[in-house]
Each structure stands twice: as C-alpha cells, then as structure tokens.
C-alpha cells in the first residue's frame, strides 16, 4: 500500500497545475481519476480505494498523516520528534505511533503549512513558533538548526466541549464537597491561583472554575494562546498576546494586556498563565478592586508557587523581597495545587488558604489535602481529597444564611 500511495501521489501531481490553488472538489476529481486508472490493472477493494483517496487528499491539501491523529478524539497530545518518531498521549498513556512522515522535507512542509494557517513564518531565521490550529489546538514548532534531529512539533489538542467541574468529579480529580467549596469562593470573589506541574491540567481546571463566575459580570481573559472556553458570560472580552516578528517590533505582551484591561472596566481578570514580569501587574490588579481574579502558574507545591511569583516580580522590577511577599500574600486568597499522578491521572493535590506574611514566611493554612491510600490491582491510585481540621480564616466576603443553613456571599 505504501508504494502504491507514492505512485498515486506522483500521478496526482502530474495531473495538477501545482501553482494553482486547486479546490477540494477538483482535487478529489483528479484523485478519483488516478485511483480508477491504477485500479484497472491492480485489484483494489472499495475499502482500500477510499483509504487511499483520503490519504492522498490529506497529504496534498491538509496535514498529511497528522490529520488522522487530529481527528481522533481520544488523543490529547501529539509529539513529533523528527519525521520518523511520533508519540501520542491517549487516555493518559504516551505511546509511539506506528506511522512516520515520508521524509524530513515533508515534515518541514507540514510545519510551514501550520504556520501559514495563522499568517506566521517559520524558517531557519525564525526557527521557533507558537501558534494554534483552526480548532484551537495549541502548537509549538522548532526547526533545525535548533532542533538537531529535525523538526519538532508538539500539539496539545483543543476540544469543542470543555471539561466542566462535574466531569472532573466523575474522573476523580476532585470531590463534590471540595468542588462546592471552590464554587462558593469563586462566586464570592476570592482571588484564586491554580498551580501545578506540566500536564497537570491547570488550564482545564481554570476553565472549570471560570464557569462558576456569575453570568452578569464583565470578564477579561488574557492568554498567551487562547484556550479558555468560558460559557454563558455575555460580557466577555478575550485578549491574546502578539509576538514580535522580523519585520518590526510589534509585540503585545501579557503585561501590556493586563495594563490595558484595567481600563476596560473589568469585574474580573483571568490570566491563563502567569510566568514572567507580568506577575506584578496581576498581583496589583488582584489587590486593587478586581477581586475574584484567577490565574495559573507552574510550581511543585502551593508554597513553591508563591516563591516563584516573587522571582517573576523581580524579573521586572527591583524591590525588596519582603515587600513583594507581602503584596503576594495580600493579593492571593486561595491556591489550588494540581498533580499528575504516577498512574497518569490528574488530581487536586491540595487547596490552601494564604492568610498573610509573618516572620519572613507565608502563612499557609491547608484546607483540603489528597490522601493516598494505595493502589488497585491495575496500578490505579486509590485515595481521596480530604477536608483538613482548619476553617477558612478570611470570611469577610461570606455570611451565614439562616434560610439555607450554609455560608453564602455577603450581600
């Protein structure tokens, strides 16, 4: 089949005017003619004809063998390490795919196609590009000479229907009790930071939290690459950074967007990921009347997240460390730390209240902690997110409801 595919592909190119932007309909007509001609003296089943038809179309007009992976809803991440080595993450497991691109040049061509989809350029002069596909999937591409063994393309897929908190409860990522607690905090405008390592599900969890925001609020989202899918908020402004290119320095950074958003009369600001000097602007926004703001960051623990935020602030301004720490403690109310477990599942590892800064240390109070109890026969981790013997100290935004017998947002 492989030799036949390349033979057919050559015949299709011979019949096409390669300088012409051929329509899908015309391309399929040429492909069908070529398949018919070759099937006259080769036995081809209907299944194989249809398979070759789609493979040829994908190779010429779409993203070649990548298209098959992009259309598989069970695949969450695609990792291409040169044209021969393709790895996929499917249902939490990373495996090597049994297919490869026909050549290094073909993979480079695919990288060019992906970049062109969003009017970007990738070449030896600009060997690193971050972009996204039409469906919103996030793409990072690196070409030689930076990528020694050939083009590296990493795709994190995007789903039309975002995972909500109910689905996270079903998956065992969080308990119903903890989810209800976080829903109350979001609605009552607590500033929440979601932390965790790479692949721990920070963006997914941030999106789930965002859907607790009251629908009558004005929300500004700021992202490096637009991924959030906030449902039901009509007064929503989505902002995305713009990186500089070779022609001119026209970069618009997250820091620029945070500063601009403050003049847009936001009720809340959501920053997809805080990872640089924009941390100071985010903290100032949280601490100056934009309660209920949300963001994420890379860290190994709740405490580590606060330390990393200090380092981020110092990237943009020279300030005493203690002054920065006090501002962090004043701005952030809650940290939700996520963890990707050894069985590849994602869990809320701890929910921690930031109560202040005293004696050169952050005052952190654990409210929920994941307690591991063992493994089942398949290696799946058994455990639960347990409420700790600590009450929420900052209750200024809450009041007791006599009608429901529960806490509610202060009116």
Name the predicted role of every residue range.
Residues 72, 85-188:
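P-loop NTP-binding catalytic core
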């Amino acid at each position: 089949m492989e030799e036949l595919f390349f033979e057919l592909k050559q015949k299709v190119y011979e019949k096409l005017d390669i300088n012409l932007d051929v329509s899908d309909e015309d391309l399929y007509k040429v492909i069908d003619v070529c398949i018919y001609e070759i099937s006259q003296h080769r036995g081809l089943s209907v299944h194989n004809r249809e398979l070759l038809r789609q493979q040829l179309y994908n190779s010429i007009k779409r993203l070649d063998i990548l298209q098959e992976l992009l259309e598989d809803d069970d695949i969450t991440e695609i990792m291409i390490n040169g044209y021969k080595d393709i790895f996929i993450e499917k249902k939490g497991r990373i495996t090597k795919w049994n297919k490869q691109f026909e050549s290094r040049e073909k993979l480079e061509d695919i990288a060019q196609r992906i970049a062109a989809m969003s009017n970007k350029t990738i070449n030896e002069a600009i060997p690193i590009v971050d972009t996204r596909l039409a469906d919103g999937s996030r793409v990072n591409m690196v070409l030689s000479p930076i990528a020694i063994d050939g083009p590296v393309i990493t795709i994190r897929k995007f789903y039309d229907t975002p995972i909500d908190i109910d689905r996270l409860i079903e998956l065992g990522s969080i308990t119903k009790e903890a989810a209800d607690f976080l829903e109350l905090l979001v609605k009552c405008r607590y500033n929440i930071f979601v932390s965790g390592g790479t692949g721990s599900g920070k963006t997914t969890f941030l999106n789930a939290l965002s859907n607790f925001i009251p629908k009558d609020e004005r929300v500004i989202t700021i992202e490096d690459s637009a991924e959030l899918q906030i449902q039901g908020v009509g007064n929503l402004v989505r902002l995305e950074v713009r990186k500089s290119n070779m022609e001119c320095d026209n970069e618009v950074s997250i820091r620029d967007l945070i500063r601009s958003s403050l003049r847009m009369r936001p009720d809340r600001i959501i920053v997809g990921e805080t990872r640089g000097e924009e941390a100071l602007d985010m903290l100032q926004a949280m601490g100056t009347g934009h309660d209920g703001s949300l963001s994420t960051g890379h860290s190994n623990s709740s405490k580590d997240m606060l330390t990393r935020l200090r380092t981020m602030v110092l990237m943009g301004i020279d300030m005493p460390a203690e002054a920065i720490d006090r501002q962090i403690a004043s701005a952030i109310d809650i940290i939700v730390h996520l963890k990707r477990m050894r069985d590849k599942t994602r869990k809320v590892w701890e929910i921690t209240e930031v109560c202040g800064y005293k004696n050169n240390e952050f005052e952190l109070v654990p409210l929920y902690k994941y307690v591991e109890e063992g493994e089942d026969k398949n290696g799946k981790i058994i455990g639960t997110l347990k409420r700790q013997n600590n009450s929420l100290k900052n209750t200024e935004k809450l009041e007791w409801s006599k009608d429901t017998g529960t806490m509610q947002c202060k009116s």
